[in-house]
């Protein structure tokens, strides 16, 4: 991808929710960004807003033409909107499903095309688009399957790309480092002073926390409940698209993304469009001013020292995969921290795994992955063995501070998954200091947030915490970012996001799972069978399957994943309590994971035995994250580790050099955005 675009185009601000707002769009242009008027349905309100915009905007502006716009291309040309004179749009953004074609307007304007996958991107390039808007799955309205973080990595094309979805100051900088030529904000602008948003909608936005959206027929919308929520007659794309809007929430679906919570934060911190555009621009400039982010990736970084190893890299616990001592040894031998997944193993199974791993590791750091939600008897049995054999580290998924404290008291440094800002604040107040921030790009159980909005939210919480607790507290904090990390580009982006924390002394590293499935050592050491690796390499998409109320897991499409709904329904017919259904489904997952990863299944007597590849393919659950869509070739652990550390640091340095030249950043300039972020 290329960054060949003007600095004016680095920050694109689209009027939110498919509503034309000339005042807001023109404010973006005046602030030095590219203000874009969403023409919505193309009704009289849109026509008047466009006419007003043409006379109001002193700087270049654009229009967005979504799937429901009734205006024709001819009406956008100057003089065709009912008011003679005024400026022409600088650019036209065609939304997914737009009735306009690139060729309809390419002779008059720069045409940017919104895309949600690689196929749409290639089609836009063939049609002659000037650039692409990578609309991640966390965005509001029509979306695809890949998050912004994953989609940007997937679009390795020689054409300018703007990232839309989950954009705040940290992720804006990361997107630019990752190769984007700019970023797009929309719902983030909704509560700023210039916005003319209806107060009822504004009130809904102020209460958002990022986990209150839902995918409905390929559209992300606000999940509203109660008698005032609109009734959706059919869960199909046309019906849902026709109900999108922000004028009457009793009859319309608000097309807001996971980043909707940022609207309140932007309004609180910056207040108006001018300060917001400057803050985003300054965050990018500050990110490339020095090598703080790159240093976090190199040998001997703060996280490396905290781990007691060479690299700031952890291999995430993977049920029925990272349960082999030989695989843990291979990970540790190349300088990373391996984690053995205990999942639902009983006491005897836990002992067998950990005794072998303990002996193999010979005093080197290693860890265990535990489920904080596992049945109490299983947790108790596992804890007895863990306390006895004392791995150096632990990760507790769905855990609580009390569980972490019990392990810490045994001398085991313990990380908690913190899946929301609310939980993170609770954990910090309880004294926890080691966290995993896992975006929904991961394989297996995932939370409601994709990486970009989650990391933007969680790092802001930590920065606020440090501002009140004092800078000395930074030395206690250790943070692992997970989800979609697998190569130079992705690790460089993650390091850029975390750079403000790194600069304050927080230890930051990356945690990977799916990337290890592509390594030769995963097969050689029995972590997975060759078929599992072939399935991962061939994956073109991932799917989410429901594991319990409010819980989903990411995997590769397979016969089992397609039939899963029926098996879940069978458990519900038995009228089990929800907690029992969740436990039974987790056991089912473990059994099917074993078939997929180890080629072992139970026979008619219940005993484990080897199964052939046909049964493995038919009955297996192939858990993997969105990285499976981004990779196709095998690698080695050594090459993987190099790519996300030294390779990523070098990548970041090269990108920073290019961006400093483009943005005319001097290394001796005083940073601006860091102080703004801490306000």
Regions found by a protein language model. Name each.
Residues 1-159, 170, 244-474, 639, ...:
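Active-site entrance/lid segments in N-terminal catalytic domains of soluble metabolic enzymes
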Residues 481:
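Short pre-catalytic strand/loop immediately N-terminal to key active-site residues, enriched for Gly-Thr
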Residues 25, 126, 139, 145-160, ...:
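Conserved active-site-proximal phosphate/metal-binding subdomains
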Residues 374, 484-485:
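Short, internal active-site loops enriched in acidic
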């Amino acid at each position: 991808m290329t960054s060949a675009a003007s600095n004016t185009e680095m920050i694109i601000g689209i009027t939110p929710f498919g509503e034309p707002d000339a005042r807001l769009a023109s404010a973006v242009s005046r602030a030095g960004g590219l203000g874009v008027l969403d023409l919505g349905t193309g009704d009289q309100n849109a026509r008047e807003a466009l006419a007003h915009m043409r006379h109001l905007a002193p700087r270049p502006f654009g229009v967005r033409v979504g799937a429901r716009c009734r205006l024709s291309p001819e009406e956008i040309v100057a003089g065709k909107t009912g008011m003679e004179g005024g400026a022409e749009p600088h650019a036209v953004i065609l939304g997914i499903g737009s009735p306009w074609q690139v060729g309809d307007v390419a002779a008059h304007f720069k045409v940017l095309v919104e895309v949600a996958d690689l196929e749409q991107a290639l089609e836009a390039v063939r049609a002659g688009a000037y650039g692409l808007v990578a609309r991640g799955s966390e965005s509001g309205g029509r979306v695809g399957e890949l998050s912004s973080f994953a989609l940007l990595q997937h679009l390795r094309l020689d054409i300018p790309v703007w990232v839309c979805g989950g954009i705040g100051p940290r992720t804006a900088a990361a997107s630019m480092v990752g190769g984007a030529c700019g970023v797009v904000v929309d719902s983030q602008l909704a509560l700023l002073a210039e916005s003319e948003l209806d107060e009822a909608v504004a009130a809904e936005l102020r209460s958002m926390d990022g986990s209150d959206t839902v995918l409905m027929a390929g559209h992300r919308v606000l999940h509203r409940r109660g008698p005032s929520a609109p009734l959706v007659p059919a869960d199909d794309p046309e019906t849902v698209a026709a109900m999108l809007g922000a004028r009457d929430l009793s009859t319309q679906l608000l097309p807001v993304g996971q980043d909707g919570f940022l609207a309140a934060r932007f309004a609180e911190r910056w207040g108006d469009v001018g300060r917001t555009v400057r803050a985003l621009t300054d965050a990018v400039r500050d990110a490339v001013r020095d090598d703080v982010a790159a240093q976090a990736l190199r040998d001997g970084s703060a996280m490396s020292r905290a781990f007691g190893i060479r690299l700031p890299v952890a291999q995430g616990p993977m049920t029925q995969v990272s349960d082999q001592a030989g695989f843990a040894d291979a990970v540790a031998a190349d300088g990373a921290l391996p984690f053995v997944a205990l999942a639902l193993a009983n006491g005897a199974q836990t002992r067998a795994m950990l005794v072998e791993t303990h002996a193999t590791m010979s005093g080197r750091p290693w860890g265990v992955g535990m489920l904080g939600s596992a049945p109490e008897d299983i947790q108790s049995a596992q804890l007895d063995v863990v306390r006895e054999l004392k791995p150096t580290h632990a990760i507790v998924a769905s855990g609580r501070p009390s569980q972490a404290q019990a392990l810490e008291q045994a001398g085991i440094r313990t990380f908690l998954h913190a899946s929301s800002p609310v939980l993170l604040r609770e954990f910090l107040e309880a004294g926890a200091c080691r966290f995993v921030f896992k975006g929904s790009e991961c394989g297996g159980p995932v939370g409601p947030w994709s990486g970009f909005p989650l990391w933007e939210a969680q790092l802001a919480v930590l920065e606020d915490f440090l501002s009140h607790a004092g800078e000395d507290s930074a030395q206690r904090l250790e943070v692992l970012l997970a989800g979609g990390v697998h190569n130079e580009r992705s690790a460089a982006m993650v390091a850029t996001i975390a750079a403000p924390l790194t600069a304050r002394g927080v230890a930051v590293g990356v945690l990977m799972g799916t990337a290890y499935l592509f390594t030769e050592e995963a097969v050689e050491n029995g972590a997975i069978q060759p078929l599992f690796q072939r399935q991962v390499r061939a994956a073109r998409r991932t799917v989410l399957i429901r594991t319990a109320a409010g819980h989903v897991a990411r995997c590769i499409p397979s016969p089992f994943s397609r039939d899963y709904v029926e098996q879940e329904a069978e458990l519900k017919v038995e009228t089990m309590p929800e907690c029992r259904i969740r436990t039974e489904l987790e056991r089912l997952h473990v059994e099917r994971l074993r078939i997929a990863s180890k080629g072992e299944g139970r026979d008619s007597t219940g005993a484990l035995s080897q199964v052939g590849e046909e049964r493995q393919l038919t009955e297996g659950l192939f858990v993997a994250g969105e990285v499976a869509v981004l990779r196709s070739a095998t690698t080695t652990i050594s090459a993987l580790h190099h790519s996300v550390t030294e390779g990523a640091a070098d990548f970041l340095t090269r990108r920073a050099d290019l961006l400093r030249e483009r943005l005319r950043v001097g290394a001796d300039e005083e940073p601006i955005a860091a102080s703004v972020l801490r306000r």
